Amino acid sequence: MDRLKHALGEATGWLLFLSFLMLVAVALPPQVFDPESKHFIMLIGLIGVWRYSMGIIHFLRGMLFLYVVYPYYRRKVEKLGKDADPSHVFLMVTSFRIDALTTGKVYGSVIKEAINCGYPTTVVCSIVEMSDELLIKSLWEKLDPPDRVKLDFVRIAGTGKRDGLANGFRAISRHMPDEDAVVAVIDGDTVLNEGVVRKTVPLFQDLPQHGWPDHQRILRSAGRLRHERVAQVRFAQRHINMCSMALSHRVLTLTGRMSVFRAVVTDPEFIVDVENDNLDHWRLGRFKFLTGDDKSSWFSLMRLGYDTFYVPDASIHTVEHPPEKRFVKASRKLMFRWYGNNLRQNSRALKLGVQRLGWFTSVVLFDQRVSMWTSLLGLTVAIIGSIKYSIAIFIAYLLWVCSTRLVLTLLLSLSGHPIGPAYPLILYYNQIVGAVVKIHVFFRLDQQSWTRQDTKLNRELASFQSWFNNWSSKAMTFSATSIFIAVLMLSV
């Protein structure tokens, strides 16, 4: 019955969306489609060749990797058999201020994977609360793993995830792992699906210079449906983009949910990079990275000469807890953290150079810097054009948005993700609101905060420096936005 209700709800949603699309098409004045009309010429200019060409390239590369290249790697590893087995597997989980129900699910799945994978395995628990330790010990006794599976606790002070990771890495280094050992870093809200370890770690034998993230999906139990839908759209887009970048062995992030490394994590230089990462900014000065440990680990691997890869058939579930009950406020908070981490990495990643990153990766990193403006180009021109000329321009833009987001939604389904009638709206919401948040955070890279706990970066600056950073950020945001709008008003 629930499945029938869901199917009827989805069908109703699609009918409403398609009906709205037809109404917009009917409301569109015929002269908009006249090639002689200046409105038609303007509409063509709104398409945004750069943005859509990058999207098409990512999609084609992603499908090539997903259905051709990755299956080739998988077949090669399967032929190796036992020769692809690692000498030891370390499953390190970091937990802080996560509810007991989620913690139980996470550690239960990790211990089961340690038992079922068949490799010598050590579960490393980087935890703060004694209650977590007691819960893990009770799960350990209940599941009763064999002698080849060990348990190692690392108690941390609760000063942040970076310290938890660094202490966990040092605990692993004390085991003195050899070069064939593999380390999986797992977030405290990540539930491992069955077989994820066996699907992942053997690939290192064929790709000896890699550390990579695993594919992720969302668990519906921890948030409202609209939060879940947004996360599903984001994961579907990330899935295609990661497949595209994996074609160049340059996946641009080692997702904090689950990443797998060679024992390079025991390198003191790598540990310091994760624990005490910082950025020197020409206006804001030097500041530490509070969030974005996954970006720090990616940058460190790139700098140390390693490559990154993606395993699309190794799935995990994440228990997502929205930071706010209100959808818009929660999404803004999450975007502020995501895009802040992205831009803080981006500003220095390009300095690694084309020889290290490759041409395509360098172009993608550049696109990340300009996409905050190109994403707003169509909407801004449509508003200006409708004010200066005719409301028909905005109606044409609305039709274009609905049509293209419908096509994008259908393309997302080719990645193996389910789609729904809300996806076109969510795609556009993410584009516009995401671009605005990105512009805001671009001029405030020193402002960082966690969404799970109320922790913010306190730089303890002198009063003048704090005042200067605050007002210069506002001034630069206003100036950049004014120039953007002025150029478009003169061009339209």
UniProtKB/Swiss-Prot annotation:
Protein function: Possibly a processive enzyme that polymerizes GDP-mannuronic acid.
Metabolic or biological pathway, per its Swiss-Prot or TrEMBL entry: Glycan biosynthesis; alginate biosynthesis
Q: What is this protein called?
A: Glycosyltransferase alg8
Q: What is its main location?
A: membrane
One molecular function GO term is: hyaluronan synthase activity
BP term (GO), one? extracellular matrix assembly
Task: Identify the gene encoding this protein.
Answer: alg8
Which family does the record assign?
Belongs to the glycosyltransferase 2 family.
| Organism of provenance | Azotobacter vinelandii
Coiled-coil-forming residues are: none
Task: List the top taxonomic levels of the source.
Answer: Bacteria, Pseudomonadati, Pseudomonadota, Gammaproteobacteria, Pseudomonadales
Q: Which residues cross the membrane?
A: 13-32, 47-69, 379-401, 421-443
Give the enzyme's EC designation.
2.4.-.-
Q: How does it sit in the membrane?
A: Multi-pass membrane protein
Q: Which GO terms describe its cellular component?
A: plasma membrane
Q: Where in the cell is it found?
A: Cell membrane
Pfam families on file: Glyco_tranf_2_3
Q: Which UniProt keywords apply?
A: Alginate biosynthesis, Cell membrane, Glycosyltransferase, Membrane, Transferase, Transmembrane, Transmembrane helix
